[in-house]
Amino acid sequence: MAPSAARCHGGCVSRSGQCVLVPRPEQRGGFIERGDVIDGRCLVAGHLAGDRAWYSRPDHVVVVVMENHSAADISGNGEAPYINALAARGALFTRSFAVAHPSEPNYLALFSGSTQGVTSDACPLTLTGTNLAAELAQAGGTSAGYSEGLPAVGDPVCSSGTYARKHAPWVNFPSLPATVHQPFTAFPSDFAALPTVSFVIPDLDHDMHDGSVATGDTWLAEQLRPYATWAEGHNSMLVLTFDEDDRSRDNQITTIIVGAHVRAGRYDEHLDHYRLLATLKALAGLGNSEPGALQPITDAWTR
């Protein structure tokens, strides 16, 4: 049956029984949903006209940030069997880099697209301007940062036991609601209830900052293996990255993405915290229209 006008979406119209592209198609970071166009071809009821292939935006993305180890420290390390298992079944970015030393400016870059001029682990900070949580909220999405050891929802304390605020960049933006800042105990057991984008921040004992690689790897396996397994069958993604390496000039780190619609393999394209943020925004459908904006990852997804 010829496609009707109602089934030709986005920048496409029905002409002579075919969906055809009109001059200025909408494109959203390579991720396809109803109303979009890819490779100059039109979507029909959410699929490419004449093509069974499709793309899907994930319902949730969970970003876990570990600490202070280079890619060389982790790759093939017998003390990190779980991380290396994730790398084997997911997308491993072999040229992934942090943007600064010490920790805090890296977290700010990943969350807000800027180090905000911060060159230390200062606390407290009061910052303004755009950030991922604010952009998500404006677009109708949701976000949360789940920090292990945080005493209470929204607590602005700089440190408490093995919790460190310097690893929770959202706290530094007072325009965000306190509910963005959650203890890890609030991480949903019903994974379908996860926010659009969330961050998991292990404490200093479990993020490899103070504890060993083996301790951090074991924590990841115990705490996040159920979610990572669930994600692969439920349109969800887990991103594992590090804030920085061991303070070398190269600052090369491990970044792995696993989950639904992730094309397993090794990717040697350049990736840093800024480009990872651009990818998180694209995954959430936010776009990245600023002049000179970095392009998100587009080749690590299946159709």
Regions found by a protein language model. Give the residues of each.
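Extracellular/cell-surface secretome signature
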Residues: 1-48
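Flexible, surface-exposed loop/gating regions in the mature catalytic domains
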Residues: 51-303
